């Protein structure tokens, strides 16, 4: 990287880096630095009457106040922040005071990692702090952090642009309070979920992410190519069909927590790569699964929040069992006045069009009902509500309802206006399943790119016999959103999918060279604000010479100054 591509602060930091090395200080030491305390523990366990506690801590320097022979630094470790008192003659007991006067005061920067050995004390202002006896550099930072400043209770220079926060999550975690806590709560959600399932006797398993058939859900898959087999493969859209194979194989209950991939849109509730938990238990039905799900979510909410409720968007959402249960067709009738019972595909499509919905001939009856529910019903269910008994056209992997012809034993759990879980009494009739797959292929022939493909191996597994089974899929990212009160899925993903980063248009160095500009001077031109060759077309040669000469002098580059005639040649070539 050319030095002129760096900011002023980055250049200064690299100069400090070089000076440290010249002083014999390794800015990136390899040796272990064992610590024995965290900032939060130091504060919580401090007692004025105790003997001073000897501690070794390490962390990122987030602030510094230099006051002659004594200074204060703010150190941030993985748990929190603590003040460090640094006295020149304490860390430099002999005649050489370079560690304090040069290294600490001049060469260290905000963002550097330091190690401190010393003891705990309380300052005259009452702040629990660490009195440094030894100090060392553990890692030099080369980019300046965006440091939030406060004045009269107002924050300035906040790092709060969502795109920057999501793209540079590592910076977000450093400078914004509460971000790390969200991801620690996510870990609590997963840990509690596993604990409940393990204690119930169910086995965590892993199934293929690369699949030859994208089955188990209605979604558009990502496609890749497996060179060794010269075969197209799919990133899985669900784990369902492989987990059911394991139920066929004799497991009582299996679950998987893993990534699924759907080649669809991105918004505040959807990411193309997402985490899902699927659970399948033999000899159970969807009624049992509703009761199990209620207790599971109540347990998770208590683990995260200390109580079975959470405030989201100003609404108190209660996860305390039991939840309301409402058939989907009743929900549509309740919200629209239209009764889908007994209606044909054409009648439902006509009603959708009457309501101004964007529907077409490729949509079958199930898809139309799904669109109706999404348009008029889904967003209205704030409290946890089981939407049950879906039409068979919407549920190709679900057992027919035991008492309601044309419907299936399926539920979706709605919370805060969004789907959180999807569950069935699983279809285990191999003949019925094959017929459902064939119906799905007919939808695909009509243009539905989310219709399921026939999975012949799954049908073969069913033919060996699968016991009565209930299964559920829970979107972990949405679950974490609910448990942490976040309204954007990007807030609970460390690194959400982003659009390509916008970059300032620049002419390539090679393009500058093609019009006669030497490589070194091409970087100087960029530093002077001429990013495109077209930017110099209206410049006067003498004025341009002065501008780039100032850059040459400021950064002590020592380049031989081009003549006015040389620069005029560049301008002429740019206008050619």
Predicted region positions:
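Class II aminoacyl-tRNA synthetase catalytic cores and aaRS-like
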Residues: 1-504
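Compact, charge-rich alpha-helical regulatory domains located at protein termini
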Residues: 501-576
């Amino acid at each position: 990287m050319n030095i002129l591509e760096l900011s002023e602060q980055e250049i200064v930091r690299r100069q400090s880096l070089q000076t440290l090395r010249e002083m014999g200080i390794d800015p990136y030491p390899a040796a272990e630095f064992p610590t024995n305390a965290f900032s939060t523990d130091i504060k919580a366990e401090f007692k004025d009457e105790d003997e001073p506690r000897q501690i070794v801590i390490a962390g990122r320097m987030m602030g510094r106040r230099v006051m002659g022979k004594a200074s204060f630094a703010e150190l941030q470790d993985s748990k929190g922040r603590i003040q460090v008192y640094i006295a020149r003659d304490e860390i430099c007991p002999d005649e050489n005071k370079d560690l304090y006067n040069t290294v600490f005061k001049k060469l260290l920067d905000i963002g550097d990692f330091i190690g401190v050995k010393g003891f705990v004390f309380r300052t005259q202002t009452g702040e629990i702090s660490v009195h440094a006896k030894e100090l060392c550099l553990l890692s030099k930072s080369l980019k300046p952090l965006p440091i939030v400043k406060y004045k009269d209770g107002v924050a300035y220079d906040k790092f709060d642009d969502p795109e920057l926060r999501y793209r540079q999550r590592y910076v977000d975690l450093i400078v914004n309070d509460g971000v790390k806590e969200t991801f620690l709560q996510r870990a609590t959600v997963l840990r509690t979920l596993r604990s409940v399932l393990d204690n119930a006797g169910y086995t965590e398993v892993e199934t293929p992410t690369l699949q030859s058939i994208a089955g188990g859900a209605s979604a558009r898959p990502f496609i890749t190519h497996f060179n060794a087999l010269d075969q197209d493969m799919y990133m899985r859209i669900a784990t369902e069909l492989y987990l059911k194979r394991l139920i066929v194989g004799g497991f009582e209950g299996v679950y998987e927590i893993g990534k699924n991939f759907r080649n669809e849109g991105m918004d505040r509730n959807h990411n193309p790569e997402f985490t899902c938990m699927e659970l399948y238990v033999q000899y159970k039905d969807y009624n049992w699964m509703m009761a199990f799900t209620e207790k599971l979510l109540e347990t998770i909410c208590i683990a995260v929040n200390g109580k079975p409720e959470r405030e989201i968007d100003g609404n108190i959402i209660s996860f305390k069992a039991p939840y309301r249960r409402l058939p989907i067709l009743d929900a549509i009738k309740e919200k629209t006045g239209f009764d889908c019972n007994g209606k044909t595909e054409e009648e439902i499509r006509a009603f959708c069009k009457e309501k101004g919905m964007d529907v077409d001939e490729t949509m079958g009856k199930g898809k139309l009902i799904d669109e109706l529910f999404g348009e008029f019903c889904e967003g209205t269910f704030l409290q946890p509500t089981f939407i049950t008994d879906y039409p068979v056209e919407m549920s190709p992997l679900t057992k027919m309802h035991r008492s309601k012809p044309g419907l299936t034993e399926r539920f979706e759990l709605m919370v805060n206006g969004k789907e959180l879980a999807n569950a069935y009494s699983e279809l285990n009739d191999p003949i019925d399943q094959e017929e459902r797959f064939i119906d799905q292929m007919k939808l695909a022939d009509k243009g539905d790119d989310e219709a399921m493909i026939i999975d012949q191996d799954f049908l073969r597994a069913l033919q060996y016999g699968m016991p009565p089974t209930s299964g559920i899929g829970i979107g972990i990212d949405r679950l974490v959103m609910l448990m942490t009160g976040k309204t954007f899925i990007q807030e609970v993903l460390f690194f959400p999918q982003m659009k390509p980063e916008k970059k300032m248009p620049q002419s390539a160095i090679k393009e500058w060279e093609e019009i006669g500009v030497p490589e070194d001077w091409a970087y100087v031109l960029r530093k002077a604000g001429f990013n495109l060759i077209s930017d110099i077309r209206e410049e006067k040669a003498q004025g341009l010479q002065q501008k780039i000469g100032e850059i040459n002098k400021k950064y002590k580059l020592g380049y031989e100054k081009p003549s006015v005639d040389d620069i005029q040649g560049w301008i002429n070539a740019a206008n050619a």
